[in-house]
Amino acid sequence: MPLYHFDLVNTKTILDEGGAELHDDIEAMDSADTIARRVLDERPDLKDRHYFILVTNEDGEEVFRLPLEIIH
């Protein structure tokens, strides 16, 4: 299974060092949504500060970008 990374990005990047092995890009996008919701549960102050979850594959290519602002 491919390895995906989920970094929290604003002016600085908090890297996902370990990543997660997932079936495909769709599952990675679903995981990004789960991670974003968890981040906002723990740090609601980040919602309106232009943070996003950057999903990359094992080759470092961007798969998806999920702005925290759109999470309800």
Task: List PLM regions with ranges.
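Short aromatic-glycine-(Arg/Gly/Cys) micro-motifs in beta-strand/loop hairpins
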Residues: 1-15
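A short, charged, amphipathic alpha-helix used as a generic interaction element across diverse proteins
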Residues: 24-44
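A generic structural signal for short beta-strands and their flanking turns/coil linkers
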Residues: 2-4, 18, 49-51
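A short, exposed loop/beta-hairpin motif centered on an aromatic-Gly-Thr core
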Residues: 14-25
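A short, structured loop/turn motif at beta-sheet edges
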Residues: 1, 24-27, 58-60
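Short, mixed-charge low-complexity intrinsically disordered segments
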Residues: 38-72
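Glycine-rich, flexible loop/turn motifs
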Residues: 10, 18, 42
